[in-house]
UniProtKB/Swiss-Prot annotation:
Function description: Catalyzes the cyclization of GTP to (8S)-3',8-cyclo-7,8-dihydroguanosine 5'-triphosphate.
Species this protein is from: Haemophilus influenzae (strain PittEE)
EC number: 4.1.99.22
Protein family membership: Belongs to the radical SAM superfamily. MoaA family.
Gene transcribed to yield this protein: moaA
Cofactor, how bound (note): Binds 2 [4Fe-4S] clusters. Binds 1 [4Fe-4S] cluster coordinated with 3 cysteines and an exchangeable S-adenosyl-L-methionine and 1 [4Fe-4S] cluster coordinated with 3 cysteines and the GTP-derived substrate.
Assigned keywords, A-Z: 4Fe-4S, GTP-binding, Iron, Iron-sulfur, Lyase, Metal-binding, Molybdenum cofactor biosynthesis, Nucleotide-binding, S-adenosyl-L-methionine
EC class (word): lyase
Pathway(s) the chain acts in: Cofactor biosynthesis; molybdopterin biosynthesis
Entry protein name: GTP 3',8-cyclase
Catalysed reactions, semicolon-separated: GTP + AH2 + S-adenosyl-L-methionine = (8S)-3',8-cyclo-7,8-dihydroguanosine 5'-triphosphate + 5'-deoxyadenosine + L-methionine + A + H(+)
Gene3D superfamilies in alphabetical order: Aldolase class I
Binding site for S-adenosyl-L-methionine: Y39, G80, S131, M202
Length: 337
């Protein structure tokens, strides 16, 4: 069994062969989603027959404890749509109470926010990312397949009322669809503490033609921001991949996630676990390493941690999107994007 390095204060024991430290876990808790976004699940969620069920609350708790002991400080609950789980609040509360977990985030389509966001705050969810691909209700409906724009906007307002001092909003950038709304998004965040994040469309196995038609480099937006006085900010060790820009005249921020940019992977600090218990070292990578068999009792913790550490030693230096290699992923819903 490969030995795991001793954890010093402020360090992670999750270190790969390129000396990148991992503080951040993206944990999918369901593949199911009630939206039909054109870039992700245009035909809606299709359950697979005779496939394993999603991780239980007990298994999720054991997993989160193992990662926390190895230096993980931030866990993000993803899906699918994580809030569709009936035990979502219990999952969040359990993770929030684990020693060492300083940040518990959720990525959501916002469908339940207006109703439930105050409870999310109470149980320890520290930050929220909500998907809003357009500020035009008709375009929102066209992209998501769901006529819920007003509900999502109301949910963002409720998040501020519940005590969140910032909300992150994700928008997948698509040429000739929502890229025309960039100025409108800037106006929207002028007086609102929203970090508006534009995510470059990423190529996956099922979406080659869609990618060719709608991909637009985030550098186009970066150039506009820099030209107009926006300033690129430094990252903390638990931040995600977004390049964040601020402007003295704006309450909000702009984030750009550009996976095709040179050296995008150099600062990688996050691992992923699927809703059925497989560890994924990269969004565009391998089939996954099975962890579920070691999530049944606390006595398995040391073996579980050794398996995670050993798997990490096989992490690649970077993805190969630039040469069209998208790995084995047909779409991103199964491991939370």
């Amino acid at each position: 069994m490969q030995s795991i390095p001793i954890k010093n204060v402020g360090e992670s024991r999750l270190v790969d062969p390129f000396q990148r430290q991992y503080y951040y876990l993206r944990l999918s808790i369901t593949d199911q989603c009630n939206f039909r976004c054109t870039y992700c699940l245009p035909d809606g969620y299709q359950p697979e027959a005779n496939k394993p069920s999603f991780l239980t609350l007990k298994e999720i708790t054991h997993l989160a404890q193992a990662f926390a002991e190895m230096g993980t400080e931030k866990i993000r609950l993803t899906g699918g749509e994580p809030t569709l789980r009936k035990d979502f609040i219990s999952i969040a509360e359990s993770i929030a109470n684990i020693e060492g977990i300083r940040q518990l985030a959720v990525t959501t389509n916002g469908y339940r926010m207006a109703k439930d966001v105050a409870d999310w705050k109470k149980v320890g969810i520290t930050s929220i990312n909500v998907s809003v691909d357009s500020l035009d209700p008709k375009m929102f409906h066209q992209i998501t397949g769901i006529n819920k724009f007003d509900d999502v906007m109301r949910g963002i307002d409720r998040a501020f009322e519940a005590g969140y001092n910032k909300v992150k909003v994700n928008s997948v950038l698509m040429k000739n669809l929502n890229d025309k709304e960039f100025e409108q998004f800037l106006v929207w965040v002028k007086d609102r503490p929203i970090q508006m994040r534009f995510i470059e469309l990423m190529q996956t196995g099922e979406m080659d033609s869609f990618f060719d038609r709608y991909h637009l480099s985030g550098q186009v937006l970066a150039d506009k921001l820099l030209k107009n006085g926006w300033i690129l900010q430094h990252k903390s060790h638990t931040d995600g991949p977004a390049k964040v820009f601020t402007h003295s005249d704006y309450a909000g921020e702009i984030g750009l996630i550009m996976p095709y940019e040179k050296n995008f992977c150099a600062s990688c600090n996050r691992l992923r676990v699927s809703a059925k218990g497989k560890l994924h070292l990269c969004l565009f990578g391998e089939e996954g390493i099975e962890l579920r068999d070691l999530l049944q009792s606390h006595e398995q913790q040391a073996i579980l941690q050794a398996r995670i550490f050993a798997a990490l030693q096989g992490k690649r230096e970077h993805h190969y999107l630039h040469i069209g290699d998208t790995g084995v992923r047909n779409h991103l819903a199964s491991i939370g994007g």
